[in-house]
Amino acid sequence: EGQAQAGERPGPRLTFSADEDTALTLIPTQRLTPQTPALDSPAPQSPTLQRLQAELAEKRPGALKAFWKQVAKQGTPLVEPLDAERVLVTFLWRQQRPGDVRLLWPTPEVNTRRFEALAGSDVRYLSLPLRRDARVSYQLSADLPDLQQADRGTLRLALQAAARPDPLSRTPWLNSRALPRAEQASLVQLGGAPAETWDQPRKDVPRGKVERLGYSSQALANQRQLTLYTPPGYDPEGQRYPLLVLFDEDHYARDVPTPTILDNLIAAGRIRPTLAVIVGNVDASSRGRELPCNEAFADMLAHELLPWLQQRYALSEEPADRVLSGSSYGGLASGCIAYRYPERFGKVLSLSGSFWWGPDEQQPQWLVRQFAAGERLPLAFFLSSGLLEEPEADGILGSNRSLRAALQGKGYPLHYREFPGGHDYAAWSLELAEGLQALLPAH
């Protein structure tokens, strides 16, 4: 059935549902053969590979062995100067036998490009120009069938099924270490990327209390998981606390360690002590129904969940102390709910928000047009999207730029950032920390 992947447009997904005692058998009906790399591969851009190519052409003894020895020593990808603002990043895979190799990367067009084969060798490679401050997670997929004619959804499913971290990389994405092997990733973090990150535990930093529980909604007649965070030293008698409401609990309590980020920011005096509730999805299909400007879901948050939290915690009564946040569809939901209930939620922290969304093809960028046409509401925004995301009007980067223009035209308080990355939790973990500092500063 069609499902959305991480807030992207729907693509195919295989879902099984059966009683406990039912046996399911998969019977292949088509065999896809591995793709043999083209013999007329273009000359490599990488100076390192150009030198290797020349040495192989000269039949220099031991050239290939020495190359792989050096790669193992320094790790991958190769990073070589390109110009004042960019470097050439070359991903490598070692394979002599036929079979497609691809990069699983948080921007769609790169996933459609195969690794090239260096003639006369077992070197497969893909070179990309990147900004000198890029930070992007990635995986590699090998031994793939011929996917040249596959649509985007089929291609992504095939890449995910074969995905693995880069075996030659020395930089794992640390937040993925506890995940299943197929979900672990490597990290490109170039020299100009921010040195300070907030998503790793720090010594001697007090930790807040984290609790996971089920929450039932009468209005929606469903149940979901919540992760609740209370800051270190929480005193219900002493003060009233800001509230962060964050969507996609399965990712923002795991891929992005939100409690750790909050612990570190609070301890460093960057933000006020803040409570957080990370709201889970009912199931895989509910995300695409509830988060894209769903009035019933917004009503549940405003009339059920918020009062439920207020009864249990010492929360500020000020809408300006309540932040809605999420990535992709979660960023869209944050904007839509604040638009519907500005008297309850006063701030929006959007990470690569899917503002291209419309209820149908005739109404693209629906939320952008609402803010552009309506009166200014008592809201403040932090918008962040990646330079590797789609710049077109119906893409993430393009629609975020459209929303920026609409908000600026109305005079909304706005922090706007374009980060050198893609649709990627490795980037969003940094951007979440930036947004919290912008919207809930300690001073």
What is each residue range found by the language model?
Residues S17-D21, T29-R31, S141-P145:
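Beta-strand-rich extracellular modules
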Residues Q5-T25:
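Noncatalytic modules at the cell exterior or secretory-pathway interfaces
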Residues G7-G11, P34-T36, V101:
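N-terminal accessory segment at the very beginning of proteins
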Residues L39-N111, L118-H443:
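Non-catalytic cap/lid and distal C-terminal segments of serine-dependent acyl enzymes
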Residues D21-P42:
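Exposed low-complexity, polar/acidic, P/S/T/G-rich flexible segments that act as propeptides
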